[in-house]
């Protein structure tokens, strides 16, 4: 998917990018490839592949109508090089975006990137989701939490649901169907007072399969969740 194909595909879906937005995506690509030589950010560096498998792929929640350009609080867990939240932020500049990532080098990249792209309303924190999830400044503060290929739902739910306000949504993007994951996560979701409202498979323009799962938070998360760092992965709910 060339940049032009990318812009045209978005336009056909009702998102006519300004020159500034096009420049932001172009500069994002350049910096991603440049920094990737210093720190491991992505295995995908071909321009057409980046525009398809990182940029277009990240925008699925917006293109499908689940995230709109409004001033709400979005948290991205384990965003790595900024996916999916920063492409979403470029498309929806009114969003307030926070990223938590466990690798400080990636946070350094994200700070540099956001300065270069002229993004405002973005915040980057180094640390573990389990620790931030028990911090009152972060717990139950977000309208949406996104996670792209981070962990299976049984684990992911404990890492993300505590950050949501009641009525907020976890939007999880994956490469594979999530049916079995949701079965395995049934107990975790019950314990966390959360409920799946969407589990949908779709295709990228090149035919590659993807999945989007949306979980609603129904009540306040019990205080003991998330458990301390490493436990959710070792002993899933």
Curated annotation (Swiss-Prot):
Main location: cytoplasm
A GO molecular-function annotation: rRNA (guanine-N7-)-methyltransferase activity
Cited CDD domains: AdoMet_MTases
Residues where S-adenosyl-L-methionine binds: 78, 83, 129-130, 148
Keywords assigned by UniProt, alphabetized: Cytoplasm, Methyltransferase, rRNA processing, S-adenosyl-L-methionine, Transferase
UniProt EC number: 2.1.1.-
Pfam families linked to this entry: GidB (PF02527)
Cellular compartments per GO CC: cytosol
Domain of life: Bacteria
Subcellular location: Cytoplasm
Class of this enzyme: transferase
Family to which this protein belongs: Belongs to the methyltransferase superfamily. RNA methyltransferase RsmG family.
Job of this protein: Specifically methylates the N7 position of a guanine in 16S rRNA.
Annotated protein name in UniProt: Ribosomal RNA small subunit methyltransferase G
Primary gene name: rsmG
